[in-house]
Amino acid sequence: MLKDIHQHRILILDFGSQYAQLIARRVREIGVYCELMPCDIDEETIRDFNPHGIILSGGPETVTLSHTLRAPAFIFEIGCPVLGICYGMQTMAYQLGGKVNRTAKAEFGHAQLRVLNPAFLFDGIEDQVSPQGEPLLDVWMSHGDIVSELPPGFEATACTDNSPLAAMADFKRRFFGLQFHPEVTHTPQGHRILAHFVIHICQCIPNWTTKHIIEDSIRDIQEKVGKEQVIVGLSGGVDSAVTATLVHKAIGDQLVCVLVDTGLLRLNEVDEVLNVFQKHLGAKVICVDAKDRFMKALKGISDPEEKRKIAGEQFIRVFEEQAKKLNVKWLGQGTIYPDVIESAKTKTGKGHIIKTHHNVGGLPLNMELKLIEPLRELFKDEVRKLGLELGLPADLIYRHPFPGPGLAIRILGEVNAEYINILKQADAIFIEELKKSDYYHQVSQAFAVFMPLKSVGVKGDARHYGYIIALRAVKTVDFMTAQWADLPHEFLSKVSHRIVNEIKEVSRVVYDMTNKPPATIEWE
């Protein structure tokens, strides 16, 4: 009997925390489905979601100001367990009758937590033990406010030197608050603390497993599609590969794969993709030469959002034309959960678009194809697990992500054939050297960016004005946050030397040392 992977679910209310998506990843790792929603979501939506537990995220605001964000009051009245993290703890305390004040000394970074009452959340969990026999935990703090007075019915369950009320609980109503961040890796026991809340307190059954997700996806595809055909666009990336494999597993020969040669793919990528999918999928693959079409559509366009939307529209139009030839009604897309989150029009009721993904916000409103997105609920690492379970080669599964609009958004400003050719060569050199030096799988994503600016240099005995190439490499678990990769200077020097010597149009190479946030991983 197939498991209902959505039967037990956790709702995470986002107060604008940089770690909100990380909380969702941790809950998924525990094996329970969850969704992330803005903290001002309406009561009807929450009741329809019917969560087994609710987590209130941290946030950048202060509860001490009257106009800042609050949790929906009714969540404290429906008998559902609630866990407040950092700001989430503070707003829960304030809303239930406690007091919150600015702290005399803000806590940022490592702290040692002394557990006063281990019941429920901290049961059996410790990093060390104090001389008095109390459990001690290493935790990560990031706050300027503290709960100064507990709400009625609560007791202090942990403290630090700077936070006498570092954790609190109302055991009867199953309300819990943590001033620290259990979701980050700097809190070593954080996963176990969250598991105690999700499994023991909320009593969720961990049905969110790779095997069950595949079974559920196949059933869903079969029910939606019936006997109709599906087109899936291949890009060479893991998302489209897993999408195609899932759809093929569900409906077999009803799948037609389409590889659109936009002229914006990486060097030799068209041949590589055709080889992989004809060999491993055994599915029908149609390659459409759309280079001239994309270049014409992108001519004169320098705005990144416009480039993304144009790429999305051209992709869909190509697929629709192929679909009409084949009488296909469905388009399979490799949309994943971070695409959905980043393309949301608002965050916490007042956010801004981070960027429009060509397979989410960039789809034309008058699209004639019906859409099927089997990965829409999954994070990138979950997609990779699915791919391995489905038997795709590891080299493909762990290939670095590549944006749908391709090199169009790795060329700053307007796109033209000269810029594309230069960027393809520079990117290929960077990736080749990463693989030769065994750094490729030590970083999560790496690529080159073309800057349409000329910088003076010297080649031979003459002054030379050439273009600038930026190199970007990051390390990340979920692509929601990322750290720039501290690659050895000798390695970067070698890559730079090759690029400026092998590509005559380039005179300068720079390396991007910016984390996400504040930057995004892609430059556009």
Swiss-Prot record:
What is the name of the protein in this document?
Answer: GMP synthase [glutamine-hydrolyzing]
Q: Which organism is it from?
A: Coxiella burnetii (strain CbuG_Q212) (Coxiella burnetii (strain Q212))
Described purpose of this protein according to its UniProt entry: Catalyzes the synthesis of GMP from XMP.
GO molecular function terms noted in the UniProt entry: ATP binding; GMP synthase activity
Indicate the enzyme's highest-level EC class.
ligase
Domain annotation Glutamine amidotransferase type-1: ranges: 9-207
One GO cellular-component annotation of the UniProt record comes to: cytosol
A Pfam short name = GATase
Origin superkingdom: Bacteria
